[in-house]
Amino acid sequence: MYSKTIIPFVCYSLFFVVSAYANPDSAVIQGGQGTTGASNSHAAEAASAIALQPQPPAAPEETGIRYNWRRDKYAENSVDTNVILSEHPANPPKPAAIAPENAVPWEHMPNKSYLIPALEVTGALGLLSVYDRVVYPNQMQDGKKVYSSNFTSTWDHMRKQNWVFDQDPFNINQFAHPYQGATMYGLARSSGLGFWESLAYSNAGSFLWKMAGETDPPSINDQITTGNAGSLLGEALFRMAELVLNDGGSKPDAWHEAGAAIISPPTAFNRTAFGDRYKTIYPSLNPATFWDFQLGSILSSSTQTAATMNFAMSYGLPGKPGYTYTRPMDYFDFEISTQASSSNPVNNVLLRGLLYGKEYHAGNDYRGIWGLYGSYDYLSPAAFRVSTTALSLGTTAQCWVGPGIALQGSLLGGVGFGAAGTTPVAEGERDYHYGVAPQGLLALRLLFGNRAALELDARGYYVTGSGQFNSLSTSSNPVDSAGGSETIIRIKSGFNVRVYGRHGLGLQYVESTRDSQYGTQPNRHQRDGTVSIVYTFGGSSHFGAVEWRDNVNQ
């Protein structure tokens, strides 16, 4: 079963290497009518909206201008003020981004299919069942082999609907299962379906597995994390894979196809299995993005020094002229952190995205979005851990606070379903708690031009309710205690400085605390502090400040 965690971990690690392909900033957003052409098929009509367009020549650098690092600005002396030029060195011509009013909605693309992903999800679950029967033939629970399901066990599950909180390890329930859900989601999404339709497929696939894939009772926690957290993760991976493909032009080469395949295998499967049917690249509408890759060493208060590898991406940062937030996850923030540890290879996976919201502004220096966010958090320090799937109300914004200095931030508050507890000291021991999880987030980034960035990220979780298996639990008699709660707070501060080009150095400190109260058990306080020194390789947008003002250099 542990291989279910190792496999996605390896995929994510490889993803770090190919993520450098994602560079949408070299395209331009044009506010006029898109180019269309006649075609004998609907597929050609949709593809004709993407046309190769040479970039305008870069404006000569003006002497005396101190802040020419900004990624995008309005073209000076241009009749069309909707054209945004990139200040990066010119690259070979790539497809022009599609104006929002001219983009063909993904769910209206030709060759959309509901049958294909239904068959694919069923087939994938069938292959997983065969794998589990071969690799784990003698895994037992409640006197039954877990992976010996048949028509009788399936009918019993369908008839009784005896849903419980299961006893699987934390990393399986909270990390491997969401990745499984992301795979089912990706099969539907890359078949032309929209976000909500694909979410339904992921939830249906999770329900099918709970009914027919195992003999143990179906679990509430798996249905929530696999179907819903998996959908959020699947959408983020789908969007990032499509950025890689978009960077390769109208016909991505083998390297771009391979990079996208590592990020989102189901997307690559449909692109390969069905020829040109699903070759259309998702109309991302040229979002403002920021990403960086970090490699270094961490020193924890509870563990020894270990190597660490991190990747973070912000997609659809507010303030980009011409970009709109009409689709779920048109803005999201994704982060994954790993370390060289066989017992705890994944430190955290953090994802939040705007499901429904609006843009707003205040004056000429402030741009933001607000609305309903979905989030999936997985935090696993050495001594304890927490994971939640939640809905929150909040805002994300950027403000120019001085010449060349920008403040970006997010403020969210909401509630979800979570799991929290200590890290077992022995394999097979299980001590974590399920319940309702109110939570909050404050994330700030102060950007000093393209030279340095100061970051602060504070998160709080309060997990209370049922689902805590205490020391009296056994595999045949789980003791589910309704009383108890946990408060977990995590604060991360960091400073990154660019040394040369896209290369930089960073220093980071993370402080995590846990306070638990369970019935007659003594209250417990734990803390974990981690210091990291990292090498940073960043994207072409440097630290990600978005420029929308047309008189910045005047």
PLM segments and residue spans:
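N-terminal targeting leaders of membrane proteins
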Residues: 22-175, 181, 189, 260-375, ...
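Alpha-helical transmembrane segments that form the membrane-embedded catalytic/substrate-binding core
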Residues: 180-181, 213-242
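Outer-membrane beta-barrel architecture
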Residues: 186, 310-316, 354-359, 392-398, ...
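Outer-membrane beta-barrel translocator domains and adjoining extracellular loop/strand segments
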Residues: 215-216, 382-387, 421-427, 466-475, ...
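Bacterial N-terminal signal peptides
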Residues: 8-17
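Small-polar-interrupted transmembrane alpha-helices in polytopic inner-membrane proteins
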Residues: 194-215, 227, 231
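Predominantly the C-terminal beta-signal and adjacent terminal strand-loop region
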Residues: 482, 486-554
